[in-house]
């Protein structure tokens, strides 16, 4: 019966009355859900999504895609290779900008976080959403999802595009914020890989004091070296004051890697939001001189480097 119903629905697409077709899908969704017919419900929604996508009816497809996540929640479906496959397939088949597509993946991330996936949501889902947001020019939101994702190559490409029109002396702020976000999730290797890729692809000339701090920080966190961590913060205090959020994040990083107690605050999620919101403006807080007072590089002289060896 379900096959016949689907065939009848799909035959109506040539008529072009997409709103009525969508309502028919929703009515069947409600019927199958009430009858606890999980497989039939998923088949219905997958088929409907793919058919609407075929006819470039993005909003209709997004409506059914969101119902698929609702179905997963109602039937308490766990995150797995099998359950994530239709989500990924549907999401990748959207073309162009569509707010419903973004909302669909946000729902999928929330579902995965509560049903067997990573507590912050599926890294694969975060990455897919981050790439899409980046393509649409929403770099602030994209960065948040790249931090929770697992693709530092695409992350670096996004940062490269984001900083194309940024003054050279301001680019170190972008990579530092990204690195701090990753370190707050204890993603040391990914932070190191991103730093190396960014400084190779994007940075021209000698590294700034802040970039040198980033490099030494990443090396320090590979070992049990809290005194050196504190010394780095002291030596690079001037550069770190360029963004008032850096202190809070370094306190969090000290807690994560060295169990240093921190005062209770808005939690990691709130801290990440504050860090990322800084990209909206005020990038040049205090500037980053490539000469003058910091040109002597006394804050990143051989004393620090020797301690790294």
Swiss-Prot record:
Biological process according to GO: protein insertion into ER membrane
Sequence segments annotated as region (Disordered): 290-309
Superkingdom in the source lineage: Eukaryota
GO-annotated cellular components: cytosol
Pfam family, one: GET4
Cross-referenced InterPro entries: GET4 (IPR007317), TPR-like_helical_dom_sf (IPR011990)
Function recorded in the entry: May play a role in insertion of tail-anchored proteins into the endoplasmic reticulum membrane.
Protein family (similarity comment): Belongs to the GET4 family.
Name of the featured protein: Golgi to ER traffic protein 4 homolog
Source organism (scientific name): Dictyostelium discoideum
């Amino acid at each position: 019966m379900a096959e016949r119903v689907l065939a009848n629905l799909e035959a109506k697409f040539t008529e072009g009355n997409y709103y009525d077709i969508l309502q028919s899908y929703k009515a069947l969704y409600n019927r199958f859900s009430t009858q606890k017919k999980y497989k039939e419900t998923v088949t219905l929604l997958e088929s409907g999504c793919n058919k609407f996508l075929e006819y470039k009816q993005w909003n209709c497809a997004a409506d059914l895609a969101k119902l698929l996540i609702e179905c997963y929640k109602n039937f308490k479906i766990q995150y797995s290779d099998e359950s994530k496959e239709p989500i990924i397939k549907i999401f990748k088949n959207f073309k162009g900008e569509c707010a419903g597509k973004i909302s669909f993946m946000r729902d999928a991330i929330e579902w995965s976080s509560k049903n067997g996936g990573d507590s912050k949501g599926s890294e694969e889902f975060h990455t897919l959403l981050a790439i899409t947001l980046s393509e649409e020019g929403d770099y602030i939101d994209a960065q948040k999802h790249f931090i929770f994702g697992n693709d530092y190559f695409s992350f670096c490409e996004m940062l490269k595009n984001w900083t194309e029109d940024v003054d050279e002396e301001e680019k170190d702020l972008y990579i530092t914020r990204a690195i701090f976000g990753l370190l707050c999730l204890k993603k040391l290797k990914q932070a190191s890989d991103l730093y190396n890729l960014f400084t190779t692809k994007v940075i021209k000339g000698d590294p700034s004091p802040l970039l040198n701090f980033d490099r030494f920080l990443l090396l320090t966190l590979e070992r049990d070296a809290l005194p050196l961590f504190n010394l780095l913060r002291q030596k690079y205090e001037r550069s770190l004051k360029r963004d008032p959020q850096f202190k809070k994040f370094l306190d969090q990083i000290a807690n994560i890697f060295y169990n240093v107690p921190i005062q209770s605050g808005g939690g990691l999620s709130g801290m990440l939001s504050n860090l990322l919101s800084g990209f909206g403006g005020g990038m040049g807080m205090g500037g980053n001189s490539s000469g003058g007072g910091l040109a002597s590089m006394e804050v990143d002289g051989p004393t620090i480097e020797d301690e790294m060896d």
